[in-house]
Amino acid sequence: MYEYFEGIISEVTPSYVVVDVNGIGYKVFSPTPFAYKQGQKAKVYIEQIVRDTGITLYGFQDQDDKGLFLKLLSVSGIGPKSAMAIMAAEDSNSLAEAIEQGEVKYLTRFPGVGKKTASQIVLDLKGKLGDYVARLDKPENGEEISPALNDALLALIALGYTQKEVDRITPKLVEIEADTADQYIKKGLALLLKK
């Protein structure tokens, strides 16, 4: 029924935000509530779930995250709470990439996801998430990324940095001249530690 709410974030908690739209506060569960700041004007994309126990609103920063949430809900054995827990534990690009590559073991690290459910996620969604997979081939400025830089970016993700953190420093890494992935990794770590 709702596509999005645009209003002021009046409250931020570990599991939900309250969006004030013209004096009405909507409690919206979010996988990333701390991405919002209290007092900030924001557009929150909404999915409304109606159950016997009540109506619950789930909110996302963009249409892609909302779409991924809906794809997860289409998997047998995944409900809204499980889908939110999965999305809260990992950024959308990494999650979609793991599904596309059939990484069942990787998916079992999410709360409430056992081997059977992880296999079902891969079975149901593999090949359907191409839009969500990160494109490390080109940064936003359109320049080509060298194989050494691409290896370095993948290594930074493997070290535990999020896709968003790595995307933030990619344009700076493209500008430097380095011959090896090790050189890019050292510079990338220095940039990430600056924050």
Curated annotation (Swiss-Prot):
GO terms for molecular function: ATP binding; four-way junction DNA binding; four-way junction helicase activity. Transmembrane segments: none annotated. SUPFAM superfamilies: DNA helicase RuvA subunit, C-terminal domain (SSF46929), Nucleic acid-binding proteins (SSF50249), RuvA domain 2-like (SSF47781). It is found in: Cytoplasm. Residues 62-140 are annotated as: Domain II. One of its GO terms (cellular component) is Holliday junction helicase complex. Residues 146-195 are annotated as: Domain III. Its main location: cytoplasm. Residues 1-61 are annotated as: Domain I. Coiled coil: none annotated. Has three domains with a flexible linker between the domains II and III and assumes an 'L' shape. Domain III is highly mobile and contacts RuvB. Belongs to the RuvA family. The RuvA-RuvB-RuvC complex processes Holliday junction (HJ) DNA during genetic recombination and DNA repair, while the RuvA-RuvB complex plays an important role in the rescue of blocked DNA replication forks via replication fork reversal (RFR). RuvA specifically binds to HJ cruciform DNA, conferring on it an open structure. The RuvB hexamer acts as an ATP-dependent pump, pulling dsDNA into and through the RuvAB complex. HJ branch migration allows RuvC to scan DNA until it finds its consensus sequence, where it cleaves and resolves the cruciform DNA. NCBIfam families: ruvA (TIGR00084). Homotetramer. Forms an RuvA(8)-RuvB(12)-Holliday junction (HJ) complex. HJ DNA is sandwiched between 2 RuvA tetramers; dsDNA enters through RuvA and exits via RuvB. An RuvB hexamer assembles on each DNA strand where it exits the tetramer. Each RuvB hexamer is contacted by two RuvA subunits (via domain III) on 2 adjacent RuvB subunits; this complex drives branch migration. In the full resolvosome a probable DNA-RuvA(4)-RuvB(12)-RuvC(2) complex forms which resolves the HJ. This is Holliday junction branch migration complex subunit RuvA. It comes from Lactobacillus acidophilus (strain ATCC 700396 / NCK56 / N2 / NCFM). The gene is ruvA.
